[in-house]
Amino acid sequence: MPTYAIGDIQGCHEPLLRLLDVVRFDAASDRLWFVGDLVNRGPDSLETLRFIRGLGDAAVCVLGNHDLHLIALAAGHGRAHKGDTLDAVLAAPDRDELLGWLRRQKLAWREGDWLMVHAGVLPGWTADEVMRHAAEAEAVLAGAHYRDFLAQMYGNAPVAWDDGLEGVERLRVIVNAFTRLRYCSAAGEMEFHHKGAPGTQPSGWLPWFDVPARKSADLAVVFGHWSTLGLVNRDDLIALDTGCLWGGALSAVRLEDRQVFAVKCRQARSPTG
């Protein structure tokens, strides 16, 4: 019963099908972990959502920033961005079923010594705190009053975690960490502007996973989000955004032995950072 973790798809449905052929995916016995950003910017967000939802228990998904953007737009919050390719989802006859399914997905998923998130985790959070904070925000997103949070979801502040945070500020830090984080300070302050590869960042910022004494370092973290980072496969993390959207590859890792599989992708968009 192998488990394959798959990088950011962003509506690139055809490469996903080719990748599943490469790994000889069997829905009756195999499992797929999706690191989020199932939709947007690629050509086939609607087909991608329908396909992954149809996998049922064979698929585990965590939410990415583009997935949350879709949920917010459908709820009448946020504003469409140049380059969005979400109109087909928003106009689909089954949009309510698809979006209801999407907002019930997780922000963090843990099995044994593996942890999956879309972007990152704050270095001051233990593994138990990661799951507890994820559950807080997941309950709001899946609940009856999710629109109240979506109306105030966007924003960078606060940039750091504090146990005393309450309300929307607390939820915003949690969601930003799981879905937007790349760099932070040694003290855990998040930086949201720089998107380049490690080594190009301004002084004082570190990749979140390289902050000294990161409290979740006892887990192997599987994540995406960071196309300029590319594929990384080391003991404490696997990074899986290999730029499918930008003409790179869609990648998967079989967790049992860390074997990497990939298919080349036709460029659907020019990188903007």
Swiss-Prot record:
Its EC number is 3.6.1.41. It comes from the Bacteria. GO terms for molecular function: bis(5'-nucleosyl)-tetraphosphatase (symmetrical) activity. Keywords: Hydrolase. It catalyses: P(1),P(4)-bis(5'-adenosyl) tetraphosphate + H2O = 2 ADP + 2 H(+). Hydrolyzes diadenosine 5',5'''-P1,P4-tetraphosphate to yield ADP. Belongs to the Ap4A hydrolase family. This is Bis(5'-nucleosyl)-tetraphosphatase, symmetrical. It comes from Thiobacillus denitrificans (strain ATCC 25259 / T1). The gene is apaH.
